[in-house]
């Protein structure tokens, strides 16, 4: 019989972290050399630990902004508050993000596709005009707290993609 030294769910967590690291890497996966495992990118593109953590938390924040409105949310506020505090702390550490609104730190949304490239070209062509400010505001989003669900919604959630979890409405304590 073979014993496992890892907790039961650690494989999924390791896979998620690995995916996030590869997804947030500044170069593509093809830049990794199979012989020594080192990337072939210049030293100016290497991630610092805080930069890597910041990009992972920003990706998670963006992910949470997509899943929370669909009815998936934390039953306790501890995990949400911890993630929000960490993202705000990292935003203060990395002031290169130009998006600030009414004293709140907001994170930029990465623009992709033709529209993002067109907006970037517009800013380069006419940096003195006001559309640059409009583009910056359009590229930012704020962290807002979604109101907690009523007790009835927690105990009897509406039919969704995953269906009700067996632990919904219960307070779980880790060993």
Curated annotation (Swiss-Prot):
<keyword id="KW-0968">Cytoplasmic vesicle</keyword>
<feature type="signal peptide">
    <location>
        <begin position="1"/>
        <end position="29"/>
    </location>
</feature>
<keyword id="KW-0732">Signal</keyword>
<dbReference type="InterPro" id="IPR024833">
    <property type="entry name" value="RESP18"/>
</dbReference>
<dbReference type="GO" id="GO:0030141">
    <property type="term" value="C:secretory granule"/>
</dbReference>
<dbReference type="GO" id="GO:0001701">
    <property type="term" value="P:in utero embryonic development"/>
</dbReference>
<dbReference type="InterPro" id="IPR029403">
    <property type="entry name" value="RESP18_dom"/>
</dbReference>
<keyword id="KW-0256">Endoplasmic reticulum</keyword>
<protein>
    <recommendedName>
        <fullName>Regulated endocrine-specific protein 18</fullName>
    </recommendedName>
</protein>
<dbReference type="GO" id="GO:0048237">
    <property type="term" value="C:rough endoplasmic reticulum lumen"/>
</dbReference>
<comment type="similarity">
    <text>Belongs to the RESP18 family.</text>
</comment>
<dbReference type="GO" id="GO:0005794">
    <property type="term" value="C:Golgi apparatus"/>
</dbReference>
<dbReference type="GO" id="GO:0043204">
    <property type="term" value="C:perikaryon"/>
</dbReference>
<dbReference type="Pfam" id="PF14948">
    <property type="entry name" value="RESP18"/>
</dbReference>
<comment type="function">
    <text>May play an important regulatory role in corticotrophs.</text>
</comment>
<dbReference type="GO" id="GO:0005783">
    <property type="term" value="C:endoplasmic reticulum"/>
</dbReference>
<keyword id="KW-0333">Golgi apparatus</keyword>
């Amino acid at each position: 019989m073979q014993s496992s030294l890892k907790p039961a769910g650690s494989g999924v967590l390791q896979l998620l972290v690995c995916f996030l690291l590869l997804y947030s890497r500044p170069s593509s996966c093809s830049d990794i050399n199979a012989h020594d495992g080192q990337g072939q990118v210049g030293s100016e593109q290497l991630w610092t630990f805080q930069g890597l953590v910041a990009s992972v938390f920003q990706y998670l924040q963006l992910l949470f902004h997509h899943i929370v409105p669909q009815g998936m949310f934390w039953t306790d506020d501890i995990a949400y508050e911890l993630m929000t505090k960490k993202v705000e702390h990292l935003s203060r550490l990395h002031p290169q993000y130009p998006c600030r609104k009414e004293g709140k730190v907001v994170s930029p949304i990465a623009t992709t596709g033709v529209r993002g490239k067109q907006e970037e070209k517009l800013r380069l062509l006419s940096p003195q005009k006001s559309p640059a400010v409009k583009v910056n505001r359009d590229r930012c989003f704020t962290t807002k707290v979604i109101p907690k669900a009523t007790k009835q919604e927690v105990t009897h959630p509406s039919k969704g993609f995953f269906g009700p979890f067996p632990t919904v409405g219960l307070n779980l304590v880790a060993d």
